[in-house]
Amino acid sequence: MPVKDAPFLEERTAAVMESVFNDPIVKKALDQAVPQEIFTIEEQIEICEVPAPPMKEQTRAAMIAEKINSYGLESSIDPVGNVIACRKGTDPDDPVCVISAHMDNSFREGTDTTVRRQNGRLFAPGISDASRALACMLQVIRMVVNNDIKTKGTLLFIATVGQEAEGDLRGVKRIFYSSGIHVDGVLVLDGADPGRLLYGSVGSKRYKVEYSGPGGHSYLNFGQYPSATQALCRAGALLANLQVPAEPRTTFTLATLNGGSSVNAIAEHAECEIDLRSEDAQMLDGLVQEVLPLFAFGAQLENQRWNVTDPALQVRCKVTPIGHRPAAVSKPDSPVLQAARAAQMALGIKLTDFTSASTDQNVPMSLGIPSTTLGGGGREGFNHSLSEWFEPVRSYEGPQLCLLTALALVGLESGSEPLLPIYTAAPREQWQDRL
């Protein structure tokens, strides 16, 4: 969605933001963020250099928990590894707003994440994604605690596990599918640019496809037995020619390919992983229904090519779901979008992008819980690569934006009412993680 289509601020939102922004204690906290950014950057570097490969975030989780405790909140680690800390509001009947950042990076275990400084930039795998978001969240905690900012609603800080790749959002799924924690709104910290706002969640469904057959000698058994790799190639060719809509943006990727055991053997095994995405949940489901039969058809074509009718000698296809990130779209009057946009305007932050992406917001947004994603501040480049960099240009705007947005959502003790409504949970069956 173009930036020009960003939501128009409602009068109530503007009034609440004006009240929060002009509160003397809040102004003091916002001003302090500028000189304190030096400490935040050093903490970002420290976080980056603590390993957190996919599915192995324990060391970093222990570090984040210890830091939160030292900053004046009591943290705990839940059964899947999320670090959770609560800053209770003065009114237990007022809303609960989550501020979250994921702990895992996208690099395999053993990757050197030592940070290098050069020409005003910081270089290291993971220095921006997600070290910046974690440092931003910790700075928001310090701003709230050190200035004793009292809110009507509750702020719940969560450092999540499993956001990247095979993690499949397992941390945030735990929070919203099975923890029993009540949440009314969500601010996810991810990326750097504080000018970007997310109105939508790009959904994805991922599958592992396996072919198995009898195998055989490439010369002696030629024409007698089907090939698992050739069945996969036939299916891949069908997928490559598939037509998908440009709007809502919908994509497919044959991501990985493996198969065969020797150059002189008919392959008895082949496998691949496919990634299907769309901004629209119904479009994503339709894409799944269109794509998965292609792989079964690939096996059928290979068996037909060699006229193999004996089931024991045919290539067989097996499809296994390996990931699901639900799709969702927010309405323009979503309180988190309203509050975030108002906070940007109050801070003089230009709206640079109003778009959809895949972040921890996917799960709560798909349940109807008001959610968006905010940048942690600064500039970034080459994320998910060994050349990843972060530039701390006005990076203090990230913590400022997050704090101001959150305070408008939960309300100040002595100020206006919270912008967040109390969320009424969907029927239990709608909360289940169905692939």
What annotation goes with each model-predicted range?
Residues 80-81, 91-97, 111-112, 118-119, ...:
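Short coil/turn connectors at secondary-structure junctions
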Residues 100-102, 158-160, 186-190, 210-212, ...:
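Short beta-strand segments
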Residues 107, 149, 198-204, 263-268, ...:
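Short glycine/proline-enriched loop/turn "hinge" motifs that connect secondary-structure elements
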Residues 126-202, 410, 414-435:
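Acidic/histidine-rich catalytic neighborhood of metal-dependent amide-processing enzymes
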Residues 103-117, 200-211, 342, 372, ...:
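Acidic-glycine-rich active-site phosphate/pyrophosphate-binding loop
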Residues 1-28, 223, 228-435:
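Metal-dependent amide/peptide-bond hydrolase catalytic core
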Residues 1-123:
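Acidic/His- and Gly-rich active-site-bordering loop/insert found
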Residues 51, 99, 117-166, 205-211, ...:
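Alpha-helical metal-binding/catalytic segments enriched in His/Glu/Asp
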